[in-house]
Amino acid sequence: MKIYITGLPSGYEVEHLARLFYPMAPLTLTPPEPAEDCLWAEKTDTGLRVLVRQGEKSKMLEAPLPLPVEQGGETPEFALASLTYDLLRQWTGIRPPWGKMTGVRPVRLIHDKRAAGWSAEQIDRFFLQRFDCSEQKYEMAKEIADLQEPILRMGSAPKTYSLYIGIPFCPSRCSYCSFVSCNLDRDRKLVQPYVDCLCREVEEIRVQAERAGLTLCSIYIGGGTPTSLSAAQLRQLMGTVRENFDLSKVVEYTVEAGRPDCTDAEKLAVIKEYGATRISINPQTFSDAVLANIGRKHSAQDILDCYADARRAGHEDINMDLIAGLPGDTVEGFEHSLRQAIALQPENITVHTLTLKRASRIVIEDQKENDYADVAAMLEKCHLLAEAGYRPYYLYRQKNTLQNLENVGWCKPGHEGYYNIYIMEEVQTILSAGAGGSTKLVADGGKRMQRIFNFKYPNEYIQRFAEVLERKKGVADFYDHDLGPEASG
């Protein structure tokens, strides 16, 4: 299925709604005459038209141009995208569970509408009628929004921020992964220089945060795989964090322990000793066959052993990640993984839906979305989490997620992941250290934002580190220039 779009300066809205039905279809804005197996969305001077054709069968919908936005109408881009959705829903018989919603933060949308004074009935109509969202997904989003409100009030207090520290090294690359990460064996020579620079950047963040009058709320060390560092390197990094920040005032300090093939008892003890209050051990699946399919070099038993080591080290707040839709997995296999995770009783279980990124080996090797038809049925098994006492506390979506589904963090009551909520709902400044880091400066409750980017690759981050430090001065400058007298208060 090819997607053709004409008559618009950008096909963004149409493309994303079409991809709800055909996630990996090629797109062109300059089409020839429609051929077999194509979707053609067109805006002309007189109206809108969408045609779908597969073989000898075709169907077309037409509509007049919408009223201008200032007269209560909508943009031609959105109107054509909506017409595309209506046609493809009729053509395929598929109703995407999130309807016409393509944004990654549906819960944020609920918060925004409530803040704008919308009634519950108005928000209901917005989701269920205008965007054709399923009642099940909308009710889950509302439940999460209700749970998040007191946490967001704390996190959105003036001049609070969270610190993210990125470790872009992994022992091997998983087949679904498209993140910038370095193979530890190949790039081991970069690790120590990288850690040295990272510690210096953490120190500079403390300086700039103090200049701006910011108060640290939470810390997250992610990756990559942070435990690909040696125990000594973890001590160096986490020691730098402890020396520069008052951890007694931090509400949450997370370290992704990640994979059991590089997480041992010594590293888990270091993480606990240096102040982390929450860790993540990420099995993705408890099937040895599926682990092999995705390139993991460890077994399900290794995950169980790592989890036991973490409990012995004194870790009392543990998250475990699972992924629905991994190659070779089945609904029954995913249910087994979910039941195994629940049996361990971690404080958090996060269920991701596989996302087909073009840089991942799954897509490169042409394992397309049709191989994963059971993913929605897998997510239906999450009722087991609710029955076991977990509740959903944050939700986000990504482009090209299988069947347009979502990622949901589940927690035992009182164990919500604060950093996850803050970064998803964009209420708080996030100061990022490390290669690929994206600092997000937030003011006025999210109404004003600015980003500061680090260099993407570890070798460039190391070689151009002086520029990294220079860019960090933009943190204090943002508050000095944008907040005026408040910046010195």
Give a label for each model feature.
Residues 1-108, 112-116, 120, 413-489:
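Radical SAM enzyme core and accessory elements
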Residues 34-36, 355, 359, 363-433:
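A C-terminal junction/extension of Radical SAM enzymes
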Residues 50-52, 165, 279-281:
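Short beta-strand motif preference
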Residues 88-95, 115-163:
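N-terminal [4Fe-4S]-dependent radical SAM core
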Residues 143, 176, 255:
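Key residue(s) within conserved catalytic/signature motifs
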Residues 159-195:
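Canonical Radical SAM [4Fe-4S] cluster-binding loop centered on the CxxxCxxC motif
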Residues 166, 280, 348-352, 421, ...:
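Beta-strand scaffold of nucleotide-dependent catalytic cores
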Residues 181-380:
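Conserved non-cysteine loop/helix-boundary elements of the Radical SAM core domain that shape
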